[in-house]
C-alpha cells in the first residue's frame, strides 16, 4: 500500500500497486476503485485536481495541478 500526494503535499489516496485497488477517503466517505492497467481517475479537492494513472501492473503515476492550471491544459 502506497500513499499518493497532490502538489501541495496532501495525501490524495492510497493504492495497492499489486492488486490495482485505490482507496480514496474524504471526510467520512471512503471510495474504493479497482483500476486496470492504462486507466486513470481524476480526484478533485477544492481547487486541486490530481490525476492518478495505473501505468503498469505494479505502478501508478500522478499529475497534480491547481484547478485553473488544469483548465488551461485541457483547453489547449
Region spans (language model):
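Short, solvent-exposed S/T- and G/P-enriched segments that are highly enriched in secreted/extracellular
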Residues: 27-39
Amino acid at each position: 500500500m502506497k500513499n499518493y500526494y497532490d502538489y501541495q503535499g496532501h495525501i490524495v489516496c492510497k493504492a495497492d500497486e499489486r492488486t490495482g485497488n485505490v482507496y480514496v477517503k474524504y471526510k467520512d466517505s471512503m471510495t474504493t476503485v479497482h483500476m486496470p492497467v492504462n486507466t486513470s481517475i481524476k480526484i478533485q479537492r477544492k481547487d486541486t485536481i490530481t490525476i492518478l494513472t495505473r501505468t503498469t501492473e505494479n505502478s501508478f503515476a500522478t499529475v497534480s495541478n491547481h484547478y485553473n492550471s488544469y483548465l488551461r491544459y485541457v483547453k489547449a
